C-alpha cells in the first residue's frame, strides 16, 4: 500500500492532537501523584510520662473524662499492643530516639548519662557516662533536618546518653513549631510531666478530680483508702494532662494544621505505681499509643499489631518519605517504607534502677509472655529510694512487714523469685498465675526460652557484662576518647569537610548563631563559620573556625 505523504501527515497530526489531552492528563496526574508521594507531613508527638493504657477511656477505663484524648482517638487509631523495651524512662527514651534496643546500645541501666547529677551513683562507683555507640547510630531527628524539617523538642533530653549537636532546631521549654520558616514541615515533641511518678506525692494535697470510692482497684493492690487515694491522684493528673494536650491540639487547629498533620500520643512506659514502673509485667512495659494520620485516615479504629519503641524512629522517617538506616533494629510500621512483615515478638529488659541492681528479660509471643529472672534471690520490690517517697509504697511496705497482704500482692515482695515465669495474657492480664510448671505448656516454655536466648545473642545484649566492666572498656583512660580533627579542602571560596570515621556527623553554624546545622554540602569560606565532628559517646573534634583570623 502506497500512502500519500500529505494524507499520512494529516492522520498523524490528528492522532497527536487527539491523544494530547490524554497525555497531558496522564502527565498531570503522574506529577500530582509524585508530588503527593514526596510531600513531607508535619509530625507531632504528645508524650505522657509514666502511664499505662488501662487508665485511659479509649482502653476501657471510664474513671476519668479525657475529652481531648478521646477525640484524638476518634480521629485516629488506638494501638492495643504498643510496648516500651524497658519499664523506665531514660533507657526507653534511648530506644525511641535511636531505633535500637537499650541492651544493644549500653543504655539499659537507669541512669548511665545523668544530666541531673554528674556523680550519678558514687556509692556504687558508677559515674555519669555516655556509652559509646556502634558507628552509624545517630539520633533520628537529624535525618529529618537533613530533609528540611524544622525539629523541636519541648523539652526533656534524658536519653541516657549525651546528645549530639545538629539534632534539634530548638530544644527547650519554649520550643515550638511556630518559629519555623513559612510552610516548612516540622517534627515537634511535647513532653508532659504532670503524670510522672513523682507527681503522685507532689500533687497529693491538690484537689482530687475523681472520687476515690468510685475507682476500681487493680488486683495487684490491696483495697485500702491509702491505695485509692494515690489512684485518685493519678486519675486527677490525667485530667490535668488532657487539658494541657488540648491546648496543643487547639493551636494546631487554629493554625489550620490539625487535619493534615500526623499526631502520636503515647506514654513513655507503664504506670507510676509499684509493680507498674520498673516491672517487666504488662503494667510496666505496655503503653498507650494513638496515631492520627493525615486527613484522619483509618479514623476511629483499633489495631492489635505489636509495636515497640524501637519502631518509632524508622516509622517517623518512613512517614517523612526517608528510608530508615539499616542499622536500626526496629521496623517501619507506617509510611513509604512500611515493613511487609508484622512483628511476632516483643522483647524487654530490666537492669539497674538507680542504686538497685537486678537483671530480667522477657519476650511476648501471641498470648504468652515469658520472663527470666537472673537473680532470683532479689525481690521484685527492690527498695529504690526514689519510689520509696510514694505514699502507696510506704503503705505497701508496712502491710508487707505486718504480713497483711494477700497472695496476689505479696508475690511481688517474696523471694526467691521463680527463675522462669510464663503467663497466658488472655486469661491472666495482670500476670498472677505462673504457668511455667504446667505440663501441657512445656513446649511453649522451651520455645520462648530458646527465642529469648537467641535474641540476647543476636542483639549483643550488653547486660551480660557488669556495668563497671563496660565503663572500663569504653573509657580505658577514664574519659571519653576525643575524635580526630576534621579534614578540609578549600577550593575557591568553598570549603569541603570530611572525617575519616564514617560514623561521625559534621555540624556547623555561623559564629553569631546558637543552633548547629547538619553539614551536607561545601560551605562558603568567606563567612565566619564554626564546624566540628560529633559522635555519641565521644568528645567532639576540635572546633574548626574559618576564615582564620
Where are these regions (language model features)?
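Formylglycine-dependent sulfatase
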Residues: 3-5, 18, 31-414, 418, ...
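Hydrophobic, well-ordered secondary-structure elements that form the walls
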Residues: 316, 422-424, 428, 448, ...
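Short beta-strand-to-coil "C-cap" segments at the C-terminal boundary of structured domains/repeats
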Residues: 292-294, 425, 547-549
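A short pocket-lining beta-strand/turn micro-motif at the edge of beta-sheets
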Residues: 418-421, 504
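Bacterial N-terminal signal peptides
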Residues: 18-28
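Short, compositionally stereotyped local motifs that mark structural "simplifiers"
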Residues: 3-4, 436, 443-450, 457-549
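Short secondary-structure junctions and interdomain/linker hinges
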Residues: 340, 354, 455-463
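N-terminal secretory signal peptides that target proteins for export/translocation
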Residues: 1-13
Amino acid at each position: 500500500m502506497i500512502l500519500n505523504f500529505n494524507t499520512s501527515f494529516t492522520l498523524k497530526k490528528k492522532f497527536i492532537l487527539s491523544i494530547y489531552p490524554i497525555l497531558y492528563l496522564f502527565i498531570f496526574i503522574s506529577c500530582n501523584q509524585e508530588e503527593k508521594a514526596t510531600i513531607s507531613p508535619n509530625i507531632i508527638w504528645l508524650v505522657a510520662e509514666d502511664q499505662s493504657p488501662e487508665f485511659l477511656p479509649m482502653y476501657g477505663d471510664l474513671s476519668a473524662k479525657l475529652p481531648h484524648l478521646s477525640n484524638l482517638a476518634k480521629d485516629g487509631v488506638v494501638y492495643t499492643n504498643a510496648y516500651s523495651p524497658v519499664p523506665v524512662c531514660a533507657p526507653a527514651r534511648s530506644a525511641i530516639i535511636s531505633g535500637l534496643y537499650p541492651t544493644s546500645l549500653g543504655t539499659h541501666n537507669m541512669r548511665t548519662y545523668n544530666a541531673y547529677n554528674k556523680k550519678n551513683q558514687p556509692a556504687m562507683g558508677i559515674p555519669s557516662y555516655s556509652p559509646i555507640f556502634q558507628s552509624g547510630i545517630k539520633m533520628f531527628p537529624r535525618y529529618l533536618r537533613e530533609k528540611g524539617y524544622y525539629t523541636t523538642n519541648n523539652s526533656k533530653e534524658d536519653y541516657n546518653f549525651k546528645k549530639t549537636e545538629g539534632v534539634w532546631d530548638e530544644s527547650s521549654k519554649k520550643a515550638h513549631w511556630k518559629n519555623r520558616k513559612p510552610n516548612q514541615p516540622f517534627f515537634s515533641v511535647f513532653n508532659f510531666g504532670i503524670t510522672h511518678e513523682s507527681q503522685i506525692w507532689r500533687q497529693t494535697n491538690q484537689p482530687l478530680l475523681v472520687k476515690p470510692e468510685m475507682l476500681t482497684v487493680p488486683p495487684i493492690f490491696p483495697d485500702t483508702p491509702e491505695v485509692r487515694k494515690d489512684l485518685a491522684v493519678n486519675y486527677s493528673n490525667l485530667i490535668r494532662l488532657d487539658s494541657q494536650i488540648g491546648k496543643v491540639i487547639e493551636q494546631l487547629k487554629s493554625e489550620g494544621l490539625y487535619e493534615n498533620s500526623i499526631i502520636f500520643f503515647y506514654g513513655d512506659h507503664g504506670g507510676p505505681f509499684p509493680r507498674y514502673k520498673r516491672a517487666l509485667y504488662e503494667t510496666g512495659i505496655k503503653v498507650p499509643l494513638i496515631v492520627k494520620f493525615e486527613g484522619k485516615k483509618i479514623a476511629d479504629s483499633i489495631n492489635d499489631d505489636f509495636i515497640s519503641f524501637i519502631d518509632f524512629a524508622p516509622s517517623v522517617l518512613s512517614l517523612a518519605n526517608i528510608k530508615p538506616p539499616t542499622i536500626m533494629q526496629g521496623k517501619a510500621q507506617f509510611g513509604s517504607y512500611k515493613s511487609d512483615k508484622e512483628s511476632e515478638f516483643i522483647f524487654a529488659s530490666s537492669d539497674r534502677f538507680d542504686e538497685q541492681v537486678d537483671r530480667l528479660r522477657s519476650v511476648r509471643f501471641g498470648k504468652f509472655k515469658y520472663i527470666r529472672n537472673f537473680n532470683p534471690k532479689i525481690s521484685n520490690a527492690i527498695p529504690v529510694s526514689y519510689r520509696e517517697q510514694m505514699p502507696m509504697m510506704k503503705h505497701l511496705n508496712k502491710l508487707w512487714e505486718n504480713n497483711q497482704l494477700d497472695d496476689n500482692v505479696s508475690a511481688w515482695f517474696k523471694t526467691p523469685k521463680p527463675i522462669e515465669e510464663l503467663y497466658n495474657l488472655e486469661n491472666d492480664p495482670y500476670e498472677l498465675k505462673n504457668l511455667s510448671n504446667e505440663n501441657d505448656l512445656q513446649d511453649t516454655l522451651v520455645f520462648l526460652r530458646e527465642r529469648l536466648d537467641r535474641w540476647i545473642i543476636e542483639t549483643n545484649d550488653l547486660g551480660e557484662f557488669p556495668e563497671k566492666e563496660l565503663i572500663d572498656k569504653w573509657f580505658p583512660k577514664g574519659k571519653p576518647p576525643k575524635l580526630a580533627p576534621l579534614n578540609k579542602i578549600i577550593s575557591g571560596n568553598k570549603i569541603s569537610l570530611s572525617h575519616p570515621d564514617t560514623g561521625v556527623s559534621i555540624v556547623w553554624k555561623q559564629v553569631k548563631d546558637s543552633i548547629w546545622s547538619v553539614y551536607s554540602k561545601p560551605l562558603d569560606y568567606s563567612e565566619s563559620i564554626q564546624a566540628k565532628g560529633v559522635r555519641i559517646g565521644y568528645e567532639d573534634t576540635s572546633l574548626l573556625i574559618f576564615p582564620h583570623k
